[in-house]
Amino acid sequence: MSDIPSDLHYTAEHEWIRRSGDDTVRVGITDYAQSALGDVVFVQLPVIGTAVTAGETFGEVESTKSVSDLYAPISGKVSAVNSDLDGTPQLVNSDPYGAGWLLDIQVDSSDVAALESALTTLLDAEAYRGTLTE
Protein backbone atom coordinates (compact mmCIF):
# COMPACT_ATOMS: atom_id res chain seq x y z
CA MET A 1 0.00 0.00 0.00
CA SER A 2 1.25 3.48 -0.82
CA ASP A 3 2.32 5.85 1.90
CA ILE A 4 -0.47 8.42 2.45
CA PRO A 5 0.39 10.86 5.27
CA SER A 6 -2.72 11.93 7.18
CA ASP A 7 -1.58 15.55 7.64
CA LEU A 8 -1.77 16.40 3.92
CA HIS A 9 -4.52 17.29 1.46
CA TYR A 10 -4.74 15.43 -1.87
CA THR A 11 -6.15 15.72 -5.38
CA ALA A 12 -7.62 13.03 -7.61
CA GLU A 13 -4.62 13.71 -9.89
CA HIS A 14 -2.31 12.23 -7.20
CA GLU A 15 -0.81 15.45 -5.90
CA TRP A 16 -0.36 16.33 -2.25
CA ILE A 17 -0.75 19.77 -0.70
CA ARG A 18 0.71 20.94 2.60
CA ARG A 19 -0.07 24.33 4.13
CA SER A 20 3.37 25.90 4.56
CA GLY A 21 2.40 29.43 5.61
CA ASP A 22 -0.57 31.71 6.15
CA ASP A 23 -0.98 32.22 2.41
CA THR A 24 1.23 29.48 0.94
CA VAL A 25 1.00 25.78 0.15
CA ARG A 26 3.67 23.29 -0.92
CA VAL A 27 2.77 20.84 -3.70
CA GLY A 28 4.22 17.48 -4.71
CA ILE A 29 3.14 14.17 -6.18
CA THR A 30 2.09 11.24 -4.04
CA ASP A 31 3.95 8.03 -3.35
CA TYR A 32 1.33 6.23 -5.45
CA ALA A 33 1.99 8.57 -8.40
CA GLN A 34 5.77 8.24 -8.26
CA SER A 35 5.46 4.46 -8.03
CA ALA A 36 3.13 4.33 -11.04
CA LEU A 37 5.43 6.62 -13.04
CA GLY A 38 8.58 4.64 -12.41
CA ASP A 39 12.01 6.27 -12.45
CA VAL A 40 11.59 10.04 -12.83
CA VAL A 41 14.16 11.49 -15.24
CA PHE A 42 12.93 15.08 -15.71
CA VAL A 43 10.58 17.55 -14.01
CA GLN A 44 9.35 20.66 -15.84
CA LEU A 45 8.17 23.41 -13.49
CA PRO A 46 7.12 27.04 -14.06
CA VAL A 47 9.34 29.96 -13.11
CA ILE A 48 8.83 31.81 -9.84
CA GLY A 49 6.16 34.48 -10.24
CA THR A 50 4.07 32.50 -12.74
CA ALA A 51 0.32 32.62 -12.12
CA VAL A 52 -1.33 29.19 -11.89
CA THR A 53 -5.03 28.38 -12.02
CA ALA A 54 -6.68 25.57 -10.07
CA GLY A 55 -7.28 22.56 -12.29
CA GLU A 56 -4.96 23.72 -15.07
CA THR A 57 -1.57 22.27 -15.94
CA PHE A 58 1.57 23.93 -14.60
CA GLY A 59 4.26 21.46 -15.65
CA GLU A 60 5.05 17.82 -16.21
CA VAL A 61 6.95 14.87 -14.83
CA GLU A 62 8.80 12.64 -17.27
CA SER A 63 9.73 9.10 -16.31
CA THR A 64 11.18 6.11 -18.09
CA LYS A 65 7.57 4.96 -18.65
CA SER A 66 5.63 8.12 -19.55
CA VAL A 67 5.13 11.87 -19.33
CA SER A 68 2.42 13.10 -16.93
CA ASP A 69 0.94 16.57 -16.61
CA LEU A 70 0.93 18.35 -13.26
CA TYR A 71 -2.22 20.24 -12.24
CA ALA A 72 -2.48 23.22 -9.91
CA PRO A 73 -4.56 22.29 -6.84
CA ILE A 74 -5.28 25.96 -6.10
CA SER A 75 -4.98 29.28 -7.91
CA GLY A 76 -2.15 31.62 -7.01
CA LYS A 77 1.40 32.58 -7.86
CA VAL A 78 4.44 30.30 -7.86
CA SER A 79 6.55 31.52 -4.94
CA ALA A 80 9.23 28.80 -4.97
CA VAL A 81 10.30 25.83 -7.08
CA ASN A 82 12.42 22.89 -6.01
CA SER A 83 15.60 23.62 -7.98
CA ASP A 84 17.17 20.41 -6.60
CA LEU A 85 14.99 18.53 -9.09
CA ASP A 86 16.97 20.04 -12.00
CA GLY A 87 19.97 17.87 -11.21
CA THR A 88 18.32 15.17 -9.12
CA PRO A 89 14.78 14.51 -10.46
CA GLN A 90 14.80 11.08 -8.79
CA LEU A 91 14.13 12.85 -5.46
CA VAL A 92 10.49 12.63 -6.56
CA ASN A 93 10.85 8.84 -6.31
CA SER A 94 13.02 8.57 -3.21
CA ASP A 95 11.29 11.20 -1.04
CA PRO A 96 7.97 12.32 -2.61
CA TYR A 97 6.70 13.98 0.59
CA GLY A 98 9.99 15.62 1.54
CA ALA A 99 12.98 16.51 -0.65
CA GLY A 100 10.99 15.61 -3.78
CA TRP A 101 8.46 18.46 -3.39
CA LEU A 102 7.67 20.39 -6.58
CA LEU A 103 6.69 23.99 -5.87
CA ASP A 104 5.08 26.47 -3.50
CA ILE A 105 1.95 28.40 -4.48
CA GLN A 106 1.08 31.67 -2.76
CA VAL A 107 -2.42 33.10 -2.78
CA ASP A 108 -3.21 36.79 -2.54
CA SER A 109 -2.56 37.62 1.12
CA SER A 110 -5.76 39.69 1.19
CA ASP A 111 -7.71 36.56 0.25
CA VAL A 112 -6.50 33.94 2.72
CA ALA A 113 -10.14 32.90 3.19
CA ALA A 114 -10.05 31.68 -0.42
CA LEU A 115 -7.13 29.41 0.49
CA GLU A 116 -9.08 27.99 3.43
CA SER A 117 -12.03 27.39 1.14
CA ALA A 118 -9.87 25.78 -1.56
CA LEU A 119 -8.26 23.42 0.95
CA THR A 120 -11.68 22.19 2.09
CA THR A 121 -12.47 21.08 -1.48
CA LEU A 122 -9.43 18.77 -1.56
CA LEU A 123 -9.34 15.15 -0.41
CA ASP A 124 -8.16 14.08 3.02
CA ALA A 125 -5.96 10.99 3.37
CA GLU A 126 -8.86 8.58 3.78
CA ALA A 127 -10.78 9.97 0.79
CA TYR A 128 -7.62 9.87 -1.34
CA ARG A 129 -6.94 6.28 -0.30
CA GLY A 130 -10.44 5.45 -1.56
CA THR A 131 -9.53 6.66 -5.06
CA LEU A 132 -6.60 4.26 -5.41
CA THR A 133 -6.76 0.91 -7.13
CA GLU A 134 -3.64 -0.98 -6.18
From Swiss-Prot:
Pfam families: GCV_H. Its cofactor is (R)-lipoate. Residues 24-106 form the Lipoyl-binding domain. The modification N6-lipoyllysine is found at K65. It comes from the Bacteria. GO terms for biological process: glycine decarboxylation via glycine cleavage system. CDD domains: GCS_H. InterPro entries: 2-oxoA_DH_lipoyl-BS, Biotin_lipoyl, GCV_H, GCV_H/Fam206, GCV_H_sub, Single_hybrid_motif. PANTHER family: GLYCINE CLEAVAGE SYSTEM H PROTEIN, GLYCINE CLEAVAGE SYSTEM H PROTEIN-RELATED. The glycine cleavage system catalyzes the degradation of glycine. The H protein shuttles the methylamine group of glycine from the P protein to the T protein. Belongs to the GcvH family. NCBIfam families: gcvH (TIGR00527), PRK01202.1 (NF002270). The glycine cleavage system is composed of four proteins: P, T, L and H. This is Glycine cleavage system H protein. It comes from Mycobacterium bovis (strain ATCC BAA-935 / AF2122/97). The gene is gcvH.
